[in-house]
Amino acid sequence: EEAADALTEALDKVLESSVLDSVNKNELKRFMSGTAMYTAFDFTGDEKYRNAAIELAKGFKDFERNDNGYFKDADDKKCLCKAYQYETFYMAYETKDGGKEQYNDVIGQYNAMNDELFATVKYSQDRTKALKKLSVYAASLIDTMEVMDQMIYEIFRKMQDYYKASVKAVLESGVAAEGMDDMDDEAELIFAYAVLKGCRMKALHTEKYEGIVLGVCDKVMSGEIFTGEDTEANDTIISMAALVYSETVRNREYQDYGRGKGGALWS
């Protein structure tokens, strides 16, 4: 209940300040509040949050695309990590209010992004940046899988394949054996979140993967993640630590969210 109150209070400030209207219409980050709007609607039943999400989703229709067919950000930079800014909300909107008409576009953008960027990131010499991009990409995929209608199995399975490949790419770099020393705190946390959620959703075998990130969970639970070289944790670290914590306390048994009901946000 306290978490719900904090969420709605923050979103009310966003809506009252019209901050969304001030964000560059060509920036993908403008969509990042969309899923939170649906979560608030689910908690409260207040239509203003749902209406805000629907209004925000209108921006998908004419959003500029790059030469490979997926959304082009204002900075013109391509990155697997940018999927996290919009794909989950795009799928959530389509499941809840879009009639699933653009499901093929959601997976189509993942397909194009994956084909163009995944191998380059996986084999990048800049290991630290690559691990962060792969971790964020994995989180985007598992979050998108959670909010879709799983009856559309072909799309669900394709995203699962991409998700598993991303997790595997991180682990093949040796981070598990080395204790994730090559990952900064943000990457470490988002990877732990993605793996824990994948285990809960049975996208990964719990027995094989959960133990790999339990050390990160221990750091969150003990507060160690907040006491590194920095004297204070920034908001991003705190938010990501909260995501990891939420997965450590949730039921490990994956609940079928109801075939036909769509994603977890509104089951």
PLM region spans:
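Membrane-interface helix-loop-helix junctions at boundaries between adjacent transmembrane segments
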Residues: 71-76, 97
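Short, charged, amphipathic alpha-helices and their helix-cap/turn boundaries
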Residues: 53-72, 105-108, 112-115
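Extended ligand-binding clefts on enzyme/binding-domain cores
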Residues: 80-84, 88-192, 204-226, 232
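CBM-like carbohydrate-recognition segments
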Residues: 1-34, 40-55, 63-68, 77-78, ...
